[in-house]
């Protein structure tokens, strides 16, 4: 039997919006939280409130920053290349692999052929400004292999293409050793 307490139902509904969580998983999490109110709900609520109040998206690079501090993109100019990703999770994956040393630029999504970057609030104008301001030599476009990711990559490539900037994209295709019969 489901709970009739509206606050719990609403909490389950809100948790169900998170990626990878359905109503059943959300219920399990809520029950765990309720059974450990002092040790879990209070610190979680405090942390969420702090993030809501203090963390914002940098208008220049799309990374997260504290509202009262300058972003890392403003302070570190020792690199001459930039890696363009769709979202923060993509940047974290590349960063954790420790395979790239340079600037990051988080677009905030992708676009399809029916819309432009301004409609999607993508940070493409600020990317162009950063390339010029920091005299960057290479732009690595690390968008996904989806239609939207490739549409975005082509748009960026067409927008910034010139003789002085090397444009690189992530490798795509068949994994080494995979036979066509397995596709």
Please state what every model-predicted region is.
Residues 2-8, 17, 27-91:
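Cys/His-rich Zn2+-binding cysteine-cluster or related metal-binding knuckle/ribbon modules and their
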Residues 148-161:
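Short Gly/Thr/Asp-enriched flexible loops that form oxyanion-binding sites at enzyme active sites
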Residues 19, 38, 51, 117, ...:
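Conserved phosphate/pyrophosphate-binding and hydrolysis machinery centered on Walker-type P-loop NTPases
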Residues 166-176:
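Conserved beta-strand -> loop -> alpha-helix junction used to position metal-binding or nucleic-acid-contacting
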Residues 181-183:
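Conserved small/polar residues in nucleotide/adenosyl-binding loops
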Residues 26, 74-143:
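Extended interfacial segments that mediate partner engagement and assembly in macromolecular machines
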